[in-house]
Amino acid sequence: MPSFDIVSEITLHEVRNAVENANRDLTNRWDFRNVQAAIELNEKNESIKVSSESDFQVEQLVDILRNACIKRGIDSGSLDIPTEYEHSGKTYSKEIKLKQGIASEMAKKITKLIKDSKLKVQTQIQGEQVRVTGKSRDDLQAVIQLVKGAELGQPFQFNNFRD
């Protein structure tokens, strides 16, 4: 039976490249001259710390980072950007988490979405991925289009397609 897996993964190497490109853009911006501003990647925690001297500049840094991610092919939906700032001394910062894997709540939403579509496929939640199995490739491709079209707040990839 044909099957495929729905996953949510980010290539950390591409994230590192995006952060380096954002830092390069930061050095070229005239509005950040003589300003303590930084974009730092923490690969252990899978997070990016954006810090600057004012909250407005932090928002500018987040936009620079978001554009760099899009240029590197990373969906900006995979960045979990908080609304509040961390403030210490004279620096404002935000800790942006990278969304990796599918949480159990999200996996249940995907499964419910697929079952509500009345397509003749079966779904299994396997850790941080969802396996979809069906009798025909057309049903599986319809599931792919269904999940791509749904606004679930997280980007998904479809891999391990077997016939």
UniProtKB/Swiss-Prot annotation:
Q: State the species of origin.
A: Pasteurella multocida (strain Pm70)
Q: Which domain of life is it from?
A: Bacteria
Keyword Nucleotide-binding included in the entry's annotation:
yes
- Taxonomy of the source species: Bacteria, Pseudomonadati, Pseudomonadota, Gammaproteobacteria, Pasteurellales
State the protein's purpose.
Nucleotide-binding protein.
> What name appears for this protein in its UniProt entry?
Nucleotide-binding protein PM1656
One Pfam match, given by its short name, reads DUF520
Gene Ontology annotations for the cellular component aspect, listed alphabetically = cytosol
CDD domains given in the database record: YajQ_like
Which family does this protein fall into?
Answer: Belongs to the YajQ family.
State any single GO MF term: nucleotide binding
Q: List the disulfide bonds.
A: none
Signal peptide extent: none
Record keywords, A-Z: Nucleotide-binding
Name the InterPro entries on file: DUF520, UPF0234-like_C, UPF0234_N, YajQ-like_sf
